[in-house]
């Protein structure tokens, strides 16, 4: 496994856990870091960035209430949710929960209430994938719970670039927390990305993902060394690994010392 830095000639070995990764300079499109960027892998809740774009493209009333239904309950992984069946929320709050807190019921309800229903939603997703040139991506449902939702780091960079053009998505995914009215009670929800709001991080887009099949995944748009950078890290074995590698990418791009962890020579990246 190697991580290639296209503009570097150094043979410095960077410990790197994710199985696939791609980091690019947004303005130039230049590849800064790359590892197995064309491998097709499950993407878990990174899916929700696509869900959000398709929902926003439909230009529905964001103040209209959505009632969480039994149909929205996860029957794939049987994941829990802090949004109870029967709760009614404005669509804008449902979108907030789907993106910031990665709530699966929220994402499912957005697809269910899409004009024409879930079938029309999936059709719109396929059209969006085609429009973005994401030829190696398959999305069959809105949450990412299905391991059939797959993509490549290369395709996900395209998705991140597109999502960065949606003000609602960038605002929501960079909120560290929010209070949402659930059945008359104010409930605090937090961003699944602990780097959001953390000192030293200038984050302009964020989404995490996890399933057993997908491992720990993250997409971020950050500012590093004066550049706007898109970072996609896929299939890390643990949150700590994913987070260490995200920090190492930022430090490396900023010419700072990277954090070293014990790693075999087969899991080192050459940069």
State the predicted function of each range.
Residues 15-19, 91-92, 116-271:
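Penicillin-recognizing serine hydrolase domain
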Residues 1-10:
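Bacterial N-terminal signal peptides
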Residues 11-154, 158-167:
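Active-site-adjacent loops and short helices of periplasmic peptidoglycan-processing enzymes
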